[in-house]
Amino acid sequence: MASTNSTNSLASITGALGLRATTVVAVLTCYIALCRGLRYLRRDQQHLQMPYKIREDFRKMTAEDAWKITKYVQSLEFPWMTKKALSFALFKTYGIPSISKLLCETQQLGKVEYAGRRFADTNILISEFLGYSPTSQRCNSAIARMNYLHSRYQKANKISNDDMLYTLSLFVMEVERWVKLYEWRVLTPMEICAFGTHWKGIGDAMGIDYSSLRHGPESFTDGLEFFEDIKEWAETYEKEYMVPDRYNHQLAEETTRILLANAPDALKPYGQNVVAALMDDRLRKAMMCDNPPPFYINMVKTVFGVRKFVSRWLLPPRPYAFQVRHVTDDPDPKSGRYFMTEYDSEPWYIKPTFSMRYSLLAWLRWAAGKPYPNGVGYSPQGYKVFEVGPKKLEGHGLDECEATRDRLMGSDRGRCPFAFS
């Protein structure tokens, strides 16, 4: 009897909708189930490949495994969102006057003529030590170059350990925060632990002191505890030191210009309100930015909400063949240089290939009178990691960088950074 009733009900639905409509509904339902199933299947498969099933296992997570997990998250699972999160992490550091003042005094971000290259150089170094194994030459060369660029200011007491620790904290936290707010799922505890473990290893290589953290300097149980500790510390630090300052405002203006470089001039005032809507109240106040009209805050929530819905229900996972790479894996066979694969305000280190020179973005930028990858200026020959930085430092610090890289390469950076905590 029950079977007969079900058959009759199905027939009634089919009759009411019509065969064509019923077929469309059935296909759409299957497609949604397939997309959602494939997304969670890949997440679960990634977890099965790693030996970190419970919290007790996290203390054994190696830096090499942590890097593999974070690379998967950033190149396959949430590439667009993690890039925006890392860009915003940098942006957020400009809300601390001790950081913004130094950057304005060096003129590397405070002046239009230098800001584009400074932004590209920073992206290169981050891409190099996030995109390649902690035991690789590329990762350790990037950290060595970054340490060299910082060292001059550290010796002059212009960069404090707290400045470095706060900057590191944002790279640890912002990806998790943005994914939680705007993506189709949150990061799992294992993934959060991986970000904590990976960045703890980078901080060690930078010589950052963790004494200010609850379990610092070296009593952290695992990457998840490190994540929780640095998040707690950063919140307290922001309350005291993220305060209004004209240097903050100057950098906010210049960075917003870079972020909106590809927007038509007529839309830039609206874009500035969108950027302001992405800030929290404390950051907006510190950067002396006007509060955006409520419409923009609601619009941002709506746009990201629609994106989250579409990603969760209507899009299959990104194929492995389409992993996102921000820099080239292989060097140019003649010059040994690498290239960036995308650009923001200026095409620094972009190889002027046919696809780059004649892309839709290039045509739009050409029509607007903006720079595009035509092989003129902006180092189209590519980059070498030890040359990255201000133009006046090209060719400087090579011996120091090589020595630091070799020391890091010999320090077993692939092991668990909490093994001796």
Model-flagged regions — what are they?
Residues 2-421:
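Mature, function-bearing regions of proteins
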